[in-house]
């Protein structure tokens, strides 16, 4: 049974993008880690509910939103690193635990979430 899916792929990609942006902006290591942590933590609990089993809705749109989140995480890291309470490692472990706890119908099955309610009719 799948434990990880879209939240992990998009969360990881967003996290890597935020860290890369922070590095390119010459930030310190703790700011880079904070950017990565903020980017990933906002994907915890995201359902994987591809409509009709395709990745158009909502997956591709979620990737676009994640790109903007990476930029937002960079901004937050620039100003709020000193206030951080949670480490990147804690967020990664929480992502794993959340994936294990999430009902299977929300794990790339097309049985829950948006996939359950979309009929294809207008």
Identify the function of each model-found stretch.
Residues 2-5:
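Short, small-residue-biased leader/transition segments that mark boundaries at the very start
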Residues 8-9:
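Glycine/charge-rich, flexible interdomain linkers and switch-proximal surface loops
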